[in-house]
Amino acid sequence: MKCLYILSGHTDRIYSTIYDHERKRCISASMDTTIRIWDLENIRNNGECSYATNSASPCAKILGAMYTLRGHRALVGLLGLSDKFLVSASVDGSIRCWDANTYFLKHFFDHTQLNTITALHVSDEVLVSGSEGLLNIYDLNSGLLVRSDTLSGADNVWNVSFKDNTLVAAVERDKRNLLEILDFS
């Protein structure tokens, strides 16, 4: 194992990371309310590059972020990535869909009346989010909420996966952890 870079910029804990294989970028989300993106193929595209001195780290290069995405008002805990979209979800109940190439904001979903978003699935067409007993399905072509369902009796939705009208949800019911398979056809 060899350390290649230290990616700097966040000012608080980092809660989610993604390596974008297609674009050769590292993406992270933090308690500091930001999403940061580093270009690992062309390091000159990033912010300041410095060299570690007198450091216990085996890495020599410290890279500043190429992009910093802002807009969430609280900890950003979840990230999702498709070919077209980078999606971020915050404990403030908001979801932001960014263009995966330009990082311009494409869609904003504000559900501040809900509790923290705990599950996220994104494809080029559909976004599914879950929180305490609630599933929301969005059409990412139109930016509209197309379905909102309460999972009766579910205390939490921990993870979701959606394909071809079938949703797999990891839920908690009465202190039991279960997988539920739901058909949306």
Swiss-Prot record:
SMART domains (alphabetical): WD40
One Pfam family linked to the record: WD40
InterPro entries: G-protein_beta_WD-40_rep, WD40/YVTN_repeat-like_dom_sf, WD40_repeat_CS, WD40_repeat_dom_sf, WD40_rpt
Gene3D superfamilies: YVTN repeat-like/Quinoprotein amine dehydrogenase
SUPFAM superfamilies: WD40 repeat-like
Keywords: Repeat, Transcription, Transcription regulation, WD repeat
Annotated WD repeat ranges: 9-48, 71-108, 111-148
Task of the protein: May be involved in the modulation of rDNA transcription.
Official protein name in the record: Regulator of rDNA transcription protein 13
Organism per entry: Saccharomyces cerevisiae (strain ATCC 204508 / S288c) (Baker's yeast)
